[in-house]
Amino acid sequence: VDVSIQQKLFQAPHMFTDVPVEITFMDANWNQQTFTKVCSGEYTNFTQLLPFHPVMVYLNGDDKLVNAVTGEELIVKSNVTKNLNYAYFTLKVENESDSSFVRIEHYRLAPDTIRKGYIRDALLISPNRYWKIDGIFSNSFKASGQFIFSGKDAAGGNLDNELLQLPNGQMHNEDSLVVLWRANQSEEWSVYDYFTVVSQGSKTDGSGRINLTEIHKGEYTLAIARKP
């Protein structure tokens, strides 16, 4: 398989070189192989020979490298609710009669920008974070999810301050919050169909939660609708 690894910056002065990165490939039967690749600069491209057809790939599964991505993985065999603190996400499995492998990652850096002009003009995408949901799901797997947003959370790393705060220090109205989704990095962001915004108190205090009434594999982030 052909692989391309992109290095992005989070509070770092430059791209790093000679970084050992573990990359794990998994097939539909959950067979895994993990390799270490030394990465330098923004892009590292290579070809990896595998004895199976991979349907999932992820980096740094054992957290040996300290970076701006924190994730958790789990095997789901029944209906269950899991608070995934490292992923800043609550997973609610509502139906599972078989077994599913789930991995959720939280990226503490800016998502790729919106490419389409009319979407870019209408929405301000989060400059600070996004999520990735991946896995090998059974045919019976059905789940929802939840995560918290806060525009005034210094203790939590100010993850949504830039998105939610207006120049005068006040907050955007939470009615203008939307969730964006895309299946993978080759696709454009679009407004996700299955979410609700739940304010905690005032709609202009910059805190609340997002409920994802369905979850699908892909990347998720927040955006604010620009005023006309």
Short names for language-model regions:
Residues 1, 119, 123-127, 137-138, ...:
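Short, ordered beta-strand-loop transition motifs
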